[in-house]
């Protein structure tokens, strides 16, 4: 690795640690010529994951976009940012492990709703109302009834 200060090729690694749940390595380096210290990151190059939207438009998957939607759904709710991040990471992990380079926005939404329903019901309803684009109050009420029935069946077990 070249020193970013003097371009010398001889550097030594002072510290190396995994980051991003082991998907990357952060290395602290020092130039053997000038003593300049700098940080490098090593990441696995991932094949882009393409999302096929409802209208057929294709775009690259963005964890940040997913996070924004989750943060919006969990706004003013007792849901920690770490929980939101773990949901986004879990969804991305499932998508990448499936091995399909293209995924429908529908399947992403269903995964998010499944995970979010276990965390906070109000956030789940908020996300579902935007994702499923409820046309009227009866569809919205049907979704709420499903949540209530699911809760009752879980408590009965």
From Swiss-Prot:
Keywords attached to this Swiss-Prot or TrEMBL record, sorted alphabetically, are: ATP-binding, DNA-binding, Metal-binding, Nucleotide-binding, Repressor, Transcription, Transcription regulation, Zinc, Zinc-finger
What are the boundaries of the signal sequence? none
What does this protein's record comment on cofactor binding?
Binds 1 zinc ion.
- Co-factor requirement: Zn(2+)
Tell me which residues make up the ATP-cone domain: 49-139
Question: What are the recorded Gene Ontology BP terms?
Answer: negative regulation of DNA-templated transcription
Q: Where are the zinc fingers (unnamed)?
A: 3-34
List the Gene Ontology MF annotations in alphabetical order: ATP binding; DNA binding; zinc ion binding
Origin, by domain of life?
Bacteria
Q: Show the InterPro entries listed in the entry.
A: ATP-cone_dom, NrdR-like_N, RNR_NrdR-like
Pfam family for this entry, one = Zn_ribbon_NrdR
Q: Which PROSITE patterns does this UniProt record tie to the protein?
A: ATP_CONE
What family, per the record? Belongs to the NrdR family.
Q: Which NCBIfam families match?
A: transcriptional regulator NrdR (TIGR00244)
What is this protein's function per UniProt? Negatively regulates transcription of bacterial ribonucleotide reductase nrd genes and operons by binding to NrdR-boxes.
* PANTHER family in the cross-refs: TRANSCRIPTIONAL REPRESSOR NRDR
Under what name is this protein listed?
Answer: Transcriptional repressor NrdR
